[in-house]
Amino acid sequence: MEPTEYRDELRSVLDTASGVVSDRLAAIHNAATPRTEGIVIDVSLDQDGEGTFGVWARYEGPDAFSLNQQIGDERELFGVIWGEEGWEPPVPHRPRKWSRVELEKVVVGVVAKWIDGLIPSTATELPWEVTTPDGTVDAVLVGPEISRGHSPR
């Protein structure tokens, strides 16, 4: 499988969850307080890089802990698990020649493009970024202000 094919197939699977994720992002945005410093979308791949991953939203700032607790499991935006018949949902398999690092970069990039279009257009007061929890991939700024060419800060 070529990188472009992998990206396209992954994006088509992500798109099936867009309605639910858009609603969750709106709820996350609406729950933010004046002390919220930003919203981070974490993409977590499994340690062996076989293909399972999760996409979670979290707050940054002094109120982060209480806000994250308030939203709870609704912070999970997307998840891939190994089921009885393979990946659930059926994301493409990692190309054999890719390392875990390569897979992680591609998944973060595809998720960032997908999430960018789902963030509420009114969410201009906060920075939004897509990254990995351990910071191994550079953060990608997303959201309505970024789409218009300027940073919210």
Region roles according to the model:
Residues 21, 41, 57, 128-130:
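Generic structural hydrophobic/aromatic packing signal, biased to beta-strands
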Residues 27-68:
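Amphipathic, interaction-prone secondary-structure segments
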Residues 58-64, 76, 147-150:
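Short, low-complexity, polar/charged sequence segments that are solvent-exposed and flexible
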